[in-house]
Amino acid sequence: MLLSKKSASFALSAFAMLFTSVALAKEAPQAHKAVELSILHINDHHSYLEPHETRINLNGQQTKVDIGGFSAVNAKLNKLRKKYKNPLVLHAGDAITGTLYFTLFGGSADAAVMNAGNFHYFTLGNHEFDAGNEGLLKLLEPLKIPVLSANVIPDKNSILYNKWKPYDIFTVDGEKIAIIGLDTVNKTVNSSSPGKDVKFYDEIATAQIMANALKQQGINKIILLSHAGSEKNIEIAQKVNDIDVIVTGDSHYLYGNDELRSLKLPVIYEYPLEFKNPNGDPVFVMEGWAYSAVVGDLGVKFSPEGIASITRKIPHVLMSSHKLQVKNAEGKWTELTGDERKKALDTLKSMKSISLDDHDAKTDMLISKYKSEKDRLAQEIVGVITGSAMPGGSANRIPNKAGSNPEGSIATRFIAETMYNELKTVDLTIQNAGGVRADILPGNVTFNDAYTFLPFGNTLYTYKMEGSLVKQVLEDAMQFALVDGSTGAFPYGAGIRYEANETPNAEGKRLVSVEVLNKQTQQWEPIDDNKRYLVGTNAYVAGGKDGYKTFGKLFNDPKYEGVDTYLPDAESFIKFMKKHPHFEAYTSSNVKFNASTDALPKK
């Protein structure tokens, strides 16, 4: 429940009074001393317990490698724990949602590997609430790690009451250090499923209230473990006094260095960023990418006055040497061998930020147990589709073309509907046909089928945009599908239907009409060029890929409030089938396309 500004202000005031008068008794001033801390951190592992593939530029060649995996995470944490003084091991939220390990085990697999990693603290992320309060409880009950979140407060009658604390205080070399937890508010309330008995409070106001109260306790060294996202936490760093270090999550940003840039990894910011708070004191902010790919390693020295300085800063990218693939002369991916392989490994071994072949035996055993069960359960039926086949795949991307289904890719409309169901507040969704790789046939649907239909691991993305821009998105996609690029760009949707001509008019436009479904009246209405709609799509086209140029222009413009929900499209498919266990197949794609008699466009 997100409170109105007036209600939130009153509630925060009451919360502040309660916190300062009861939770913390003011202490007399005391002498402080310098202390060093080793902050080791991850965030947003999203049930990625096994390694996954990425591409790097290695010695001038694009190279496929495997990165991440929780065995590597825990092995690296154990090594660094033994190596450095005063380790503090943190997880900045979003442990769950992203793979079948969550879909099938509801957080117990994630809790098991996190327990094996001996984290000191975990903060809640928005995805912790994806399965409601009951779903979060399935993660928290087996979790042996203290959970912190100051701005997420369950009512006393909630099943989540007393399951976490707003902050904790620990002692290092006789010096008290405080750590505060925060969650992202709008994303959790609007894109996840917290119960109405859970209240959410503004991130910045909560951070300042907590910092003030801890300062009154005589503590001058404060860490913020925050899933509020990089942008919000950067704002906190510059607006809130008395916080020294912010370990962030949610944005999935790789904070890196020149080593990682040389590999063409997607470094967003330097590790760590440094800002000044209103008092002029330094505040350090860092994030560790996502999907168990990075262990952040920050050495911090606090002066007696509580001023932080950095003694070490290494974002460790966890990588396997077992896969080093490049394209051969025929364009096929093949393993490097001989001198080329040795040269590649020598380059990686020379980099402080690359950690090769870390494995933890205990974690390997845990994952192996869950993997065997996952492979078995993945064949279980989640629902049944009745009626006709819903055509998809490359042969049916464009309606009414020679060789294709007259309706085009009904399967793509179906996927758009599963997104529409998941993103409960959107007005419409748009999906590219190339993202759906197969026909969806009548019969039983298993967990594995979802990942067969949607193999790219896309996440759901939203924009707030005018109707005129929605129409331009459709125009862009059709142009790319029919003329400029690939048929896979052809657009389908849910909550939206349109008619278009293959041959553009004198103004270069193909659209004849566009209608949006009014959720209140359940009536179709002409799209309003000036109205702002909340539009859902997948993160791939949201960034401008596949010819979706207008989406691409909105991507970095805050006016359009772009949000990557990090909800997996395959997970949305599974949830839809669970909600509709006997689903009658669609027979329409919601697209009327007046095709010409020209030859098929190029694939």
From Swiss-Prot:
It comes from the Bacteria. Its EC number is 3.1.3.5. GO terms for biological process: nucleotide catabolic process. Substrate binds at R397, R437, F456, Y540, V541, A542, G543, G544, K545, D546. The record marks H127, D130 as: Transition state stabilizer. Binds 2 Zn(2+) ions per subunit. InterPro entries: 5'-Nucleotdase_C, 5'-Nucleotdase_C_sf, 5'-Nucleotdase_CS, 5_nucleotidase/apyrase, Calcineurin-like_PHP_ApaH, Metallo-depent_PP-like, NadN. Pfam families: 5_nucleotid_C, Metallophos. Zn(2+) 1 binds at D44, H46, D94. GO terms for cellular component: outer membrane-bounded periplasmic space. PANTHER family: 5'-NUCLEOTIDASE-RELATED (PTHR11575), PROTEIN USHA (PTHR11575:SF46). This is NAD 5'-nucleotidase. It comes from Haemophilus influenzae (strain ATCC 51907 / DSM 11121 / KW20 / Rd).
